Swiss-Prot record:
GO terms for cellular component: chitin-based extracellular matrix. Transmembrane segments: none annotated. Residues 1-15 form the signal peptide. This is Pupal cuticle protein 27. Keywords: Cuticle, Signal. Residues 69-129 form the Chitin-binding type R&R domain. Residues 170-180 have a biased composition (Gly residues). GO terms for molecular function: structural constituent of chitin-based larval cuticle. Pfam families: Chitin_bind_4 (PF00379). Component of the pupal abdominal endocuticle. May have important role in the pharate pupal cuticle structure. Residues 45-55 have a biased composition (Basic and acidic residues).
Length: 180
């Protein structure tokens, strides 16, 4: 009896198909309609102009240096135009990379990383809008108040009698209807 169970387990485990080491994405074009998003015609619906070149690209240059102190430098270049390089140490790093986009334009990003965080720079990156004038004025007023010893912690302090800064009045004694 044990022999039959043992042989059955061996037979089942040896017949099981091992998972493939290759990633095969799900069929993205399985719709019933022909065309770029449908399943008829063999198109997956996810094609980019340089996709075939990327599949067959090779590494044409690669460098890697690591020192005992923790400093390092690495870089590589591929046959489809992707380039990357980085140098740094335990506390900070700087580097960059470039690639050719779907539109044929080469995009380059340069970055530093360290105590101040990750700081990328590139012409294709969005830029924050300018700070509105009212916000700049409020920030300057906050700096003046802090220099004068006035700190607003966001809490209500009845001992201030409604005054947030010297000379300001919150309507105390004006008949505003709010009395504490």
């Amino acid at each position: 009896m044990n022999l039959i169970i043992y042989v059955t387990i061996i037979a089942l485990t040896s017949a099981a198909e091992l998972p493939s080491r290759n990633y095969i994405p799900q069929d993205q074009g399985s719709g019933p309609y022909p065309g770029p998003h449908g399943g008829i015609g063999g198109d997956t619906g996810n094609r980019r102009p340089q996709q075939d070149a990327e599949k067959n690209s090779n590494v044409v240059k690669q460098e890697q240096e690591i020192s005992d102190s923790g400093n390092y430098h690495f870089g590589f270049e591929t046959s489809n135009g992707i380039r990357a390089e980085e140098a740094g140490g335990p506390e900070q790093a700087q580097g960059g990379y470039s690639y050719k986009g779907d539109d044929g334009q080469t995009y380059t990003l340069i970055y530093t990383s360290g105590e101040g965080g990750f700081k990328p720079q590139g012409e294709h990156l969005p830029v924050a809008p300018p700070t509105p004038e009212a916000i700049l004025i409020a920030l300057q007023q906050n700096e003046r108040d802090e220099a004068a010893g006035i700190f607003d912690d966001g809490q209500y302090h009845p001992e201030n009698n409604g005054q947030s800064r010297p000379g300001a009045s919150a309507g105390a004694g004006t008949g505003s209807g709010y009395h504490y």
